[in-house]
Every structure is written in C-alpha cells, then in structure tokens.
From Swiss-Prot:
One of its GO terms (biological process) is aromatic amino acid family biosynthetic process. Keywords: Amino-acid biosynthesis, Aromatic amino acid biosynthesis, Lyase. PANTHER family: CATABOLIC 3-DEHYDROQUINASE (PTHR21272:SF3). The active site is at Y22 (proton acceptor), H99 (proton donor). Catalyzes a trans-dehydration via an enolate intermediate. This is 3-dehydroquinate dehydratase. It is an enzyme of class 4 (lyase).
C-alpha cells in the first residue's frame, strides 16, 4: 500500500510559525513519526510540500494510478481552492484532510472547508498526532476497499 502525504502552504514553517497554535514540531519530525508508523504497518509513504496551488493540483493528479490514498493538509487553500477540491474529486482516491489546529475554534473564515465534501474524512485539532490518526484511518479505508474488491472478484469467478 502506498500513501501520498501532501502539505500545503506554510506547513514547511511548522516549529517556527505561530508555535502557540501549531506547536513546536517541525514538518520533517512529523514525517519521521509517520514513516515509523508506516513501516510498522507495511505502508510506503511519499511526501510533498508546496506553497503553490498549481503544484498541489499537479501532485494530486499524479496520484491517480500511483498511490492507494492521499493525506492532505491543504492549509490556507482548504478555505479557498476550488482547484484542489476538483483535483481530489477527479482522482477519486480515498483522501483524508488533516489540520493541526482546531479550525472550528479559530476565525470564522477557517471554519469552511471546500475540500471536506470530497474527502473520506477530516481530522482537526489533534496537533501533529492528527497525521498519525489520518494514517491509521487511510490504512483502514484502503484495506476495506481491497477486501471489497477481492469479494467482488471471487463472486465474479464463482458465476
């Protein structure tokens, strides 16, 4: 199983930027923790970070046929990007949206996600641990899909 982790604008500044909101852990440290959990679950991870909307859209499109699922923190683009929303919908892969802070306790404009309706799930407010929760969730979803396909294949074979 292969999962793409996509980090949006300013996520590369974790540990420096607004530590009171996002905590002191750097993006690279989050990725290292995810790699450890992934290795324990026989999962391969790829990581991508960009501050540019078009690059994020390109990366989502590249996921089609190459990964089993996506974990995305679209950061500020969560609230503004129809293009990212449409890319997620187009590839139709299991996708989990992650936010380190609880966006529902913050400014009103942060409380509306354009991408949530096309994601399998959303995890907010658990700090960096939210990425671990997202990883466990995407593994579960991908396993369910794999098992469903195997059952369908077996039914077709038995006809």
């Amino acid at each position: 199983m292969k999962i793409m982790i996509i980090q949006g604008p300013n996520v590369n500044m974790l540990g420096v930027r607004e530590v009171g909101i996002y905590g002191a852990m750097k993006m690279e440290e989050i990725h290292e923790q995810m790699k450890l959990a992934a290795s324990q679950n026989n999962v391969e991870l790829d990581f991508f970070q960009s501050n540019f909307e078009g690059e994020i859209v390109d990366k989502i499109q590249e996921c089609l046929g190459t990964v089993d699922g996506i974990i995305i923190n679209a950061a500020g683009y969560t609230h503004t990007s129809v293009a990212i929303r449409d890319a997620i919908a187009a590839v139709a892969l299991p996708t989990i949206e992650v936010h380190i802070s609880n966006v529902y306790r913050r400014e009103e404009f942060r409380q509306k996600s354009l991408i949530a309706p096309v994601c399998s799930g959303t995890i907010v407010g658990f700090g960096p641990f939210g990425y671990h929760l997202a990883l466990m969730g995407i593994i579960q979803i991908c396993e369910q899909i794999k098992n469903l396909r195997a059952m369908q294949q077996a039914q077709q074979t038995n006809k």
